């Protein structure tokens, strides 16, 4: 919760104080205040919880994680809107119509993972209608090749291709082993060992704004 609030606040400050080489870019950026916050290390998260990426139980864990992720990002942006004002282009977003991610996700997911929402979305919807959001978009999931190296995490929302991978860097090839290999190696599902790509198809669309 607090990490997501910190990420939203920190990136909001960057939008305000960074230098813009083109005036049009500054006007558009500050009017939309678009963020692209995602998470890395999903495979490690599942392994720590004793769930294999290819297991259907993983879908439930991802659902729970993603609901919290989206809820607290929106709540943090809403809180900033109350403090500092909503973004200028808020009225151009789906949020201004009271539409939230829980309304727009692909309903086919309910056939493979149907669980009750845990957070107070009705409260959040009303608060967003009343006060708006500080940002027009908040989340985006990316491969995170570089950031996963810095934090020694698995790539974004992807399963690892191997326990040991070799990645390119400016200083040459860099070897990286999956987090907690010694204790969690039996909990990881490697990409090439997955019986099908169903989990990738159902997991990948979930964490989007």
Regions found by a protein language model. Name each.
Residues 205-209:
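A short, hydrophobic C-terminal helix/tail in secreted or cell-surface proteins
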Residues 3-204:
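Long, C-terminal-biased catalytic regions of enzyme "large/alpha" subunits
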